[in-house]
Amino acid sequence: MARGGWRRLRRLLSAGQLLFQGRALLVTNTLGCGALMAAGDGVRQSWEIRARPGQVFDPRRSASMFAVGCSMGPFLHYWYLSLDRLFPASGLRGFPNVLKKVLVDQLVASPLLGVWYFLGLGCLEGQTVGESCQELREKFWEFYKADWCVWPAAQFVNFLFVPPQFRVTYINGLTLGWDTYLSYLKYRSPVPLTPPGCVALDTRAD
């Protein structure tokens, strides 16, 4: 039994390695991005359901997140390949190029993906272009500031230590919390503005 179990485990690991080679890697990265984005939305919806009695799970919302995530997967796949070609780096000797990769990633890919996220979801959910652009203007800088707080350190580790074929998978592994935040940013309820007169009345009532 023990020997048979080890053989099955080795076969399973060998089969898993195929997912990170050749054309299969593109599929793995694409589906991984979609699945993690949908999972992040699922986590966020679970929190909302607990906080707001009567709210039910919205599968269409998670499906939209999955679709947008899958659309980003090929871009990320080829983006990292391009960065490796432009700024080859191996170990600590490649430290200057690693810093260049992180900077280029933050200045180019991060804002592009932010625009992609809000406009893509807006399109899937029936928003007009004007509505999507208005939402982008309202939320983009909050997204981008949070991105700078999270991803430079993560990408530094990614470019310095993670083998190229595992880079998108590494990011996907870290991204569940980030995708939960993106779902919150996209779907949070707007805070109603209270007229000044109402504030004054409330204050007097206290």
From Swiss-Prot:
Subcellular location: Membrane; Mitochondrion inner membrane
Membrane topology of the entry: Multi-pass membrane protein
GO molecular function ontology, one term from the record: mitochondrial large ribosomal subunit binding
One GO cellular component, as annotated: mitochondrial inner membrane
Transmembrane regions listed in the UniProt entry: 20-42, 63-83, 102-122
GO biological process: mitochondrial ribosome assembly; positive regulation of mitochondrial translation
Entry superkingdom: Eukaryota
InterPro entries recorded: Mpv17_PMP22
Keywords for this protein: Membrane, Mitochondrion, Mitochondrion inner membrane, Transmembrane, Transmembrane helix
Subunit description: Interacts with the large mitochondrial ribosomal subunit.
Family to which the UniProt record says this protein belongs: Belongs to the peroxisomal membrane protein PXMP2/4 family.
Function: Required for the assembly and stability of the mitochondrial ribosome. Is a positive regulator of mitochondrial protein synthesis.
Record-given protein name: Mpv17-like protein 2
The organism's taxonomic lineage, starting at the top: Eukaryota, Metazoa, Chordata, Craniata, Vertebrata
